[in-house]
UniProtKB/Swiss-Prot annotation:
Its EC number is 2.3.2.6. GO terms for biological process: protein catabolic process. It catalyses: N-terminal L-lysyl-[protein] + L-leucyl-tRNA(Leu) = N-terminal L-leucyl-L-lysyl-[protein] + tRNA(Leu) + H(+); N-terminal L-arginyl-[protein] + L-leucyl-tRNA(Leu) = N-terminal L-leucyl-L-arginyl-[protein] + tRNA(Leu) + H(+); L-phenylalanyl-tRNA(Phe) + an N-terminal L-alpha-aminoacyl-[protein] = an N-terminal L-phenylalanyl-L-alpha-aminoacyl-[protein] + tRNA(Phe). Belongs to the L/F-transferase family. Gene3D superfamilies: Leucyl/phenylalanyl-tRNA-protein transferase, C-terminal domain (3.40.630.70). This is Leucyl/phenylalanyl-tRNA--protein transferase. It comes from Thermosynechococcus vestitus (strain NIES-2133 / IAM M-273 / BP-1). It comes from the Bacteria. It is found in: Cytoplasm.
Length: 196
C-alpha cells in the first residue's frame, strides 16, 4: 500500500524524530539527527525578557510582522553565513516540511524588504525554533518578541530553541535536562494549537 508524501513526511521527520526531541543538521551531503544534554527553551511566561533598547525599537513600530510571506527567503537568510549547517539538502527538507504544513517562517519586514525571521517547526502546542537571521538591525530581535506574543496568544506551551547561546540568554532562555524536555515536549505536542 502506497502512502502519501504528507504521511511519509509525518512518519519520517515528525513522529519519529522531532516529536521525540531530535533536530536536524546538515553535514556535507548527509543529514544527521541530534539532541542535546541541555535543551534551551524560550519562556512563554513572565520570565521572557528583552533589552530596554529593544523596547524603544518596538515602540517605534519600524517593523511589520508576517507569517510565511517568503518562506524561501527566510531559509536562505538562515543559511547565509560563513559556517552553516543548513546545507542544500537540508533546505530541501525544510521546503518539504513547509509544503506539508509543519515548517513555518515568522518574519519582520520594513516595507518590501525582509528584515529578519525565525524558521521553525510546529507540532501541536510546540514551536521548535530551527534558526533565525536578520538583514536589518533588530529584525530578528523584534521577530523573537513578536513570536513569543503570537505563541502566547495561540496558547502554545513550548518554545524550543534547541541550543543555548548568549544571544538567547538575553531573552530569558534557560536550559532543562533531556528528561524534563521530553516531558514538556510530550505535553505540548498533545495540545491542539493553530499557529496560522
Amino acid at each position: 500500500m502506497e502512502i502519501s508524501q504528507a504521511e511519509w513526511v509525518r512518519d519520517t521527520f515528525i513522529d519519529h524524530r522531532y516529536a521525540q526531541g531530535y533536530f536536524l543538521m546538515g553535514a556535507g551531503d548527509r543529514l544527521e539527527w541530534y539532541t542535546s544534554r541541555q535543551r534551551a527553551l524560550i519562556p512563554l511566561d513572565e520570565r521572557f525578557r528583552y533589552p530596554a533598547s529593544l523596547r524603544r525599537v518596538l515602540n517605534q513600530n519600524r517593523f511589520q510582522v508576517a507569517i510565511n510571506r517568503d518562506f524561501s527567503a527566510v531559509v536562505e537568510g538562515c543559511a547565509d553565513r560563513p559556517m552553516t549547517w543548513i546545507t542544500p539538502r537540508l533546505k530541501e527538507v525544510y521546503h518539504l516540511l513547509y509544503a506539508t504544513g509543519w515548517a513555518v517562517s515568522f518574519e519582520t519586514w520594513q516595507g518590501d524588504e525582509l528584515a529578519g525571521g525565525i524558521l521553525g517547526i510546529v507540532i501541536g502546542g510546540a514551536f521548535i525554533g530551527e534558526s533565525m537571521f536578520y538583514r536589518i538591525p533588530n529584525g530578528s530581535k523584534v521577530a523573537m518578541v513578536k513570536l513569543v506574543e503570537h505563541l502566547r496568544q495561540r496558547g502554545f506551551l513550548l518554545f524550543d530553541a534547541q541550543l543555548q547561546n548568549p544571544h538567547l540568554e538575553r531573552f530569558g532562555a534557560y536550559v532543562v535536562s533531556p528528561r524534563k524536555y521530553r516531558q514538556l515536549l510530550a505535553q505540548a505536542i498533545r495540545k491542539p494549537c493553530q499557529f496560522l
